[in-house]
Regions:
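Class I S-adenosyl-L-methionine
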Residues: 1-70, 406-439, 447-449, 454-466, ...
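Flexible, glycine/threonine-enriched loop-and-boundary segments that flank and lead into catalytic domains
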Residues: 54-80, 205-233, 253, 315-317, ...
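Proline-centric
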Residues: 82-85, 125, 271-275, 520-530, ...
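Signature of N6-adenine DNA methyltransferases within the class I
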Residues: 93, 100, 127, 132, ...
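Short, glycine/acidic-rich hinge or "gate" loops at secondary-structure transitions
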Residues: 43-59, 110-114, 148-156, 586-599, ...
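SAM-dependent methyltransferase catalytic region
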Residues: 6-11, 15-311, 337-338, 343-344, ...
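Terminal accessory regions of large proteins
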Residues: 592-593, 601, 607, 612, ...
Length: 864
């Protein structure tokens, strides 16, 4: 934990702690039985039935291993097995058990079996000397358990670590000396490199090293790392290239260029190099090599030249000590020859724990269970762009990829900016004075910035701004920044969130004048922007993406490789998609955390009756310009009054209509794209209500198959808006922002008339959160009563205040004093625009408006 907490690159002495993890025992058995065990059975087919009962994790191939693909050995003593990243010896111990049983079956004594395993069969290597010692101890203890007399034997397991001091002496022969000197030079970095070191020795030089192996630990290591093995079984270290120290990084780039993305992929290449032809390696590692573009060359090489015989696709929760979705694994067996038959795959992703996954594997009922996928041809994977290991892909989806053009052929798909230090260059828009904020021009400092965000479809997540003053001068100077694809900046686009663990991709329409981040990568359609957005939000696209890359990240390359088809119903699809964007945009701007926010929803509904809501069109419901019209009318005409409870009911009705319309639209779009791609037998168009991405500020939850309204949230949004009115952030008689900058003018602070009442803006942007009888005439409780009277009518004031308190389950005074600040911080993502000042014991509390604060604000609070 301490090593990972420091982040950055790992030093040589930190690599063991950063890369060691205990492999579940049943997965070790699976790997050993399907490598060492399978080689033995290929050579002794008459014993298959006897061992099949003992080896419950052995996977039967669709057909026996072809004769020309069998790795033959003469005697059991010839079978060489190794773990080149053995840790404390868990895998070595399982190899020992299996080999021991084979020896006993073939008539060897216990001592003979143990001696042959230690001297002839088994090798372990680890760069951590402590792990090596544990491994030696565990194997020796196991040997003594098998035969008590072995404690007196002078035979130890062959488990090696990196030489600390002793290197190889230089031979007298000059030519050999040059080779041995190169070996010694490489061994000096052994603490960083471990088993991935490559020693290029001529036969004569290797023979010379062999002659020194018994008395020289460096020689023993070199021999072990230049040996050809029949079987390798490993849980290799996981370490991305960004965490490698300079020595390790350079060596990997120089010697393992195609697999440099991670240390586990380096070990995949190493395993092939160290295997004999027809040998097998079993490995558990991260599933990322199966899908990510950074491992595409590795996949291509593997699929073209070697055979994935079987695989347990484990996914998340493989290691019980590692929770969450990020660490996702696969265990598999690869044979060193080209594939002559299909592979056997087990899809265990749904197991909630390692034990669940084991039971899924042991108890599968055969083909068609969505767990077992037998005899899958490797050639199928190369039909899919990027050749992901998509063993579960049906023929219908395979045809979709084969018969469609890639999306990138009609749309540019681009990564965006990496600022190098988001803490310096990014802000939420409401943190910035609107004097410095540019939403459409190029003369200010802060510009709209698209950076992924929460799972939200169609529109939204437009809440950040970036320092792009003087064409991004400061970002360009920052050493780790990257400015990509600047010619696409500020163009209309379809963006998506890079990382998602919820319901797949969420694509959104982006209006012009936005810059975009690498996490907000975007596609730039020439004409069919709404069609593209509809496709990306469809089930078809989501399933295709899960084939291209079922990890948590939707990379630019994955989007570019999607199969993309036009349709004769394109115009109809675009109309529905436009409506979805329209509804989602209206939802986004109806919250005050959007810079297009106009007016609180309850106030805007005063002019809508129940009958109006039943008959009014969707366009009128979402007409954002009507807010200012309503505000102006209420400022100029006779006072109007309304019951808050009635307005909340109207709110329910209005937003239920919009929510269900969006839901129906999404299902219709799924229906259309399922037909376009001919996937009627594969997919259904239904969309769960919890995947509809409006009303995401807790206004509703889904219970059963219906919306449950949280009226207290709706009313809290009203009180938050009221606070903004008092501070001058908003005006009741005008829509949108009013004061969001320091030093407002006298004119900006002048009182105004609304609904027949004079509305005053607080003179200093400070109001107390105190009891009604505290003596402060501008405290929040008194202001709330006045606000409710001014906006909703004096005749309903008491009824409306009682309704608020009844809904909250507490008094308004208690809400302001105990809950408002917490709710405000949550709404503004811990970037509050109203700052809380409180005495040590909380006897006195007040709120100050960020944009109106001055150096004298704390003193003014004390003096008041």
């Amino acid at each position: 934990d301490e090593v990972f907490a420091k982040k950055g690159k790992f030093e040589a002495d930190e690599i063991p702690a950063a890369t060691q993890i205990f492999t579940p025992n049943w997965i070790v058995k699976y790997m050993v039985q399907n490598t060492v065990g399978r080689i033995y059975l290929d050579n002794n087919p008459y014993t298959t039935l006897a061992y099949k009962e003992k080896w419950q994790y052995l996977v039967e191939p669709a057909e026996p291993t072809p004769a020309e693909a069998i790795l033959h050995y003469n005697e059991l003593t010839d079978l060489k097995v190794a773990d080149l990243a053995c840790g404390s010896g868990h895998i070595l111990n399982e190899c020992f058990d299996l080999l021991y049983d084979l020896y006993i079956t073939e008539g060897y004594t216990r001592v003979e079996a143990i001696t042959h395993i230690f001297q002839d069969n088994l090798t372990g290597i680890d760069l951590d000397p402590r792990a090596q010692q544990l491994s030696l101890f565990a194997l020796t203890l196991k040997a003594c358990q098998r035969d008590h007399s072995f404690v007196d034997a002078h035979c130890l397991p062959r488990v090696l670590t990196m030489p600390k001091v002793q290197l190889l002496p230089l031979p007298a022969d000059t030519r050999l000396a040059v080779e041995i000197d190169a070996v010694n030079t490489l061994l000096k970095d052994a603490d960083s490199l471990g088993s991935i070191m490559k020693f290029d020795l001529t036969p004569a030089a290797r023979e010379w090293v062999v002659s020194r192996a018994e008395e020289n630990e460096a020689a023993a290591l070199v021999i072990a790392l230049t040996e050809q093995y029949d079987a390798l079984v490993m849980n290799p270290p996981y370490m991305g290239s960004g965490n490698m120290n300079e020595v390790l990084s350079k060596y990997v780039k120089d010697n393992y260029e195609e697999v440099k993305a991670d240390l586990f992929s380096v070990f995949m290449a190493l395993a092939i190099e160290r295997l004999k032809v027809h040998g097998r390696y079993g490995m558990i590692n991260m599933q990322s090599w199966m899908f990510l573009s950074s491992f595409e060359k590795l996949r291509k090489t593997l699929l073209d030249n070697y055979h994935i015989e079987n695989m347990l696709h484990l996914g998340p929760r493989t290691f019980d000590e590692l929770s969450g979705e990020v660490v996702q694994n696969a265990a598999f067996v690869v044979a060193k020859h080209t594939a002559q038959q299909g592979g056997m795959y087990f899809r265990l992703l749904d197991g909630k724990s390692c034990a669940d996954k084991e039971q899924m594997f042991l108890n599968y009922t055969g083909q068609g269970t969505k767990i077992y996928y037998p005899n899958v041809p490797q050639a199928n994977f190369e039909k899919i762009p990027g050749c992901p290991i998509g063993y579960w892909v049906s023929k219908c989806f395979m045809n979709v990829f084969c018969n469609s053009k890639k999306l990138v052929m009609s749309h540019d798909v681009k990564k965006g900016i990496d600022t190098g230090k988001n803490e310096i260059f990014l802000r939420y828009w409401y943190e910035v004075s609107n004097c410095l904020l540019s939403l459409s021009t190029s003369t200010k400092k802060w510009f709209t910035y698209i950076k992924g965000g929460d799972f939200k479809r169609w529109y939204g997540n437009i809440e950040l701004v970036v320092n792009w003053e003087d064409d991004g001068r400061e970002i360009r100077k920052y050493p780790t920044s990257t400015i990509r694809n600047q010619q696409y900046m500020k163009r209309e686009a379809i963006t998506w969130t890079l990382l998602s663990s919820k319901c797949g991709i969420s694509a959104r329409y982006v209006e012009p004048n936005c810059l975009f981040d690498n996490n907000g990568s975007s596609a730039f359609p020439l004409a069919d922007k709404y069609y593209l957005c509809a496709f990306l939000n469809s089930k078809v696209a989501n399933v295709c993406l899960s084939i291209l890359n079922p990890t948590l990240a939707f990379q630019v390359g994955n989007i570019a490789s999607l199969p993309y088809k036009n349709s004769q119903y394109k115009s109809e699809i675009e109309k529905i998609a436009f409506q979805n964007i329209f509804i989602s945009k209206y939802d986004w701007i109806s919250h005050e955390t959007s810079w297009d926010f106009q007016q609180n929803e309850l106030i805007s509904l005063i002019d809508f009756s129940e009958e109006d809501l039943a008959t009014v069109s969707l366009t009128v419901l979402c007409n954002t310009t009507s807010h200012s019209d309503v505000a102006t009318q209420q400022a100029d005409e006779n006072p109007c009054a309304a019951k808050l409870q009635d307005l909340v009911e109207r709110y329910h009705k209005k937003w239920n209509t919009l929510f269900m319309q969006l839901h129906a639209n999404e299902e219709e779009l799924n229906r259309q794209f399922i037909d376009i791609y001919g996937l009627q037998d594969e997919l259904t168009p239904d969309v769960p209500l919890n995947e509809i991405t409006i009303l995401q500020q807790d206004e509703v939850s889904i219970e059963g198959n219906a919306l449950k309204w949280h009226d207290e949230v709706i009313l809290k949004q009203l009180l938050s808006y009221a606070a903004g009115v008092w501070m001058g952030r908003y005006r009741l008689d005008k829509s949108g922002l009013h004061i969001a900058h320091p030093n407002p003018t006298t004119e900006e602070l002048e009182p105004y008339t609304y609904n027949g009442h004079t509305i005053e803006i607080d003179d200093d942007g400070i109001f107390p959160l105190m009891a009604a009888d505290s003596g402060f005439t501008d405290n929040a409780c008194l202001r709330t009563a006045q606000f409710v009277s001014d906006v909703f009518g004096a005749e309903y004031q008491v009824e409306n205040l009682n309704y608020i308190e009844r809904t909250f389950g507490k008094t308004i005074e208690q809400y302001w004093q105990k809950d408002f600040w917490k709710d405000h911080k949550k709404m503004y993502q811990n970037r509050p625009i109203y700052w809380l000042f409180a005495s040590k014991k909380g006897t006195f509390q007040c709120i100050a408006y960020l944009h109106r604060m001055t150096p004298y604000t704390p003193e003014r609070i004390r003096s008041k």
